[in-house]
Structures are given as structure tokens and as C-alpha cells.
Regions:
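Hydrophobic, well-ordered beta-alpha structural blocks that scaffold small-molecule cofactor pockets
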Residues: 1-5, 9-164
Length: 164
């Protein structure tokens, strides 16, 4: 008991962690990681609410996502606060090997989505590519993206979306 099994880092790094300076640095890095994670969650949640309000204002209640990620999970959790139906998630990268994600149906091609009114990009890794692929499947105005994704193809800012 009390032994540390060295598996994912060099042994000298663990020796550093055991020093007061190393322990302090590891604690600081951990706190910074959690701070960034919570910041991401708060920003994503706020932007998600803006996107849902934008959709509801236009009568778009059947919403689909493009991409399985932490962002799609946050969007699914936020959806419970709005009068919308989540019709599915398209995993165009083929990375996800299941029929559901967080109780939402997963499909491999946009054409297999059940008549969404709008598709919101939630792909964190290849968001720009996903956006471009969706343009060939859906009208441009029916494809939305989170501003935090930084998609260059998506010119609208969140506040402009709700104003139009």
C-alpha cells in the first residue's frame, strides 16, 4: 500500500510530483484544467440557449446535430429546457459505433435524419468539414454552428442570429 504504479509517465516525472514544487505545480495545472473545462461548459451552454431561441423564433422545432462530442452532450442536456424535438445526430466521421448517444438516435449520413427543421454543428474535431458537407445536403440557412467552433463558413454571430 502507498505505492505508485508508473504506467503513463516517465518515472522521473513522478519523482518530481512528489517534491513540494512538483506537487504545487501539478495542483495548479489541475485547477487550470478544471477552470478551462467549466469555462467551455458555460460558454457552450449559453451559445446553445441562443441557438435554441433562434430556432424557436423561426418555428424550427425538429433539431438535429452534426457530430458527437462534449458539445453535443451539452446541447442535449440544454434541450430539455426548450420546446424542441431532437431528431438525431449525424456522425459523418464514422467514429461512433452505436445507435444512440445520450438517448438520441445516431445515423451515419445526413439523409438518414428524420426531417430536421435545422441542423446544428456540434463536431469539435472537424467542424469546418462537417459544416461544408452539410451544405450539400441542406439549405444553408438551415445549418447553424456554435460561435465557439470558429467556423469561417458561418458568418452570423449569435446575437445577429436572434435579431434577424
Amino acid at each position: 500500500k502507498g505505492l505508485i504504479k508508473v504506467t503513463q509517465a516517465p518515472a522521473n516525472r513522478y519523482a518530481y510530483y512528489l517534491t513540494p514544487k512538483g506537487f504545487s505545480e501539478k495542483g495548479r495545472l489541475t485547477a487550470e484544467y478544471f477552470s478551462q473545462s467549466f469555462k467551455f461548459f458555460r460558454e457552450a451552454r449559453e451559445q446553445c440557449n441562443d441557438l435554441y431561441e433562434h430556432c424557436i423564433a423561426r418555428g424550427w422545432r425538429r433539431i438535429a446535430f452534426a457530430g458527437i462530442s462534449d458539445l453535443s452532450e451539452i446541447a442535449i442536456m440544454s434541450a430539455h429546457e426548450f420546446p424542441i424535438d431532437l431528431v438525431g445526430i449525424v456522425d459523418m466521421n464514422g467514429d461512433y459505433d452505436a445507435v444512440e448517444f445520450a438517448r438520441v438516435r445516431v445515423v451515419s449520413k445526413p439523409a438518414r435524419l428524420e426531417r430536421p427543421d435545422v441542423v446544428i454543428v456540434t463536431d469539435l474535431r472537424t467542424s469546418e468539414d462537417s459544416f461544408k458537407k452539410l451544405i450539400s445536403e441542406f439549405p444553408r440557412e438551415k445549418i447553424l454552428a456554435f460561435p465557439l467552433l470558429g467556423i469561417k463558413s458561418d458568418k452570423l454571430k449569435p446575437k445577429e442570429r436572434t435579431a434577424t
